[in-house]
């Protein structure tokens, strides 16, 4: 199971769906409210049978024993009998995009008898060699759909431009736009 929060969870959801179609047992626990961090809700959502967890953070805390979400998850399992193996990972450093291939690498790492801890995905770490290896590029989305995600800064025209684009696509093509 991967524990993460933020926009990366959408990529992980696509990856989970892709792997589930192949019969691979993987999961995602998406954190929506980080503080206060709820032990009750975490354990209600986490399967009791989980054996290995990768906690992904999009931050680097120099000098700390681990990144914030990772440390919180580790603390929840501290002293618990039959606690799962918990490893830390970083993604999206240097504003790098996160891809389904990278999430597959995380799940493959978890499948190892001794998963790599404190790994990175999305950058090639040729200094400390913490990067997970990537395999071939995959398409984890729906083959029959086209998806776009636009970000705007507010009052920059993004919303209006996208509404117009969606209207044109819906009116002038045989595609369903929403």
Model regions: which residues?
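Glycine-rich, anion-gripping cofactor-binding loops and their flanking helix/strand elements
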Residues: 9, 13, 21, 28-65, ...
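Generic structural "secondary-structure junction" signal
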Residues: 35-39, 121-123, 161
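Peripheral docking tails and interdomain loops at the edges
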Residues: 52-141
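A structural micro-motif
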Residues: 24, 51, 83-84, 175
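Short acidic, glycine/serine/threonine-rich loops at helix termini
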Residues: 13-15, 39-41, 64-68, 97-102, ...
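Alpha-helical structural signal in soluble globular domains
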Residues: 15-18, 45, 72-80, 168
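Solvent-exposed alpha-helices and their adjacent loops that cap or buttress functional pockets
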Residues: 1, 45-48, 80-81, 113, ...
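Anionic-ligand anchoring segments at beta-strand to alpha-helix junctions in alpha/beta enzyme folds, i.e.
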Residues: 3-35, 144-178
């Amino acid at each position: 199971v991967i524990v993460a929060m933020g926009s990366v969870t959408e990529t992980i959801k696509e990856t989970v769906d892709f792997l589930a179609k192949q019969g691979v047992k993987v999961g995602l626990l998406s954190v929506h409210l980080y503080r206060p961090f709820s032990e009750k809700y975490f354990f209600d959502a986490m399967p009791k049978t989980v054996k290995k967890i990768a906690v992904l953070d999009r931050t680097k805390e120099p000098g700390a024993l681990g990144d914030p979400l990772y440390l919180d998850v580790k603390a929840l399992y501290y002293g618990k009998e039959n606690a799962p193996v918990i490893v830390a990972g970083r993604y999206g450093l240097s504003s790098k995009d996160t891809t389904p291939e990278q999430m597959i690498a995380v799940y493959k790492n978890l499948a190892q008898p001794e998963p790599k801890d404190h790994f990175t995905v999305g950058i090639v770490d040729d200094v400390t060699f913490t990067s997970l290896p990537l395999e071939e590029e995959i398409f984890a989305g729906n083959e029959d759909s086209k998806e776009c995600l636009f970000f705007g800064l507010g009052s920059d025209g993004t919303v209006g431009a996208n509404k117009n684009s969606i209207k044109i696509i819906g009116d002038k093509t045989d595609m369903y736009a929403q």
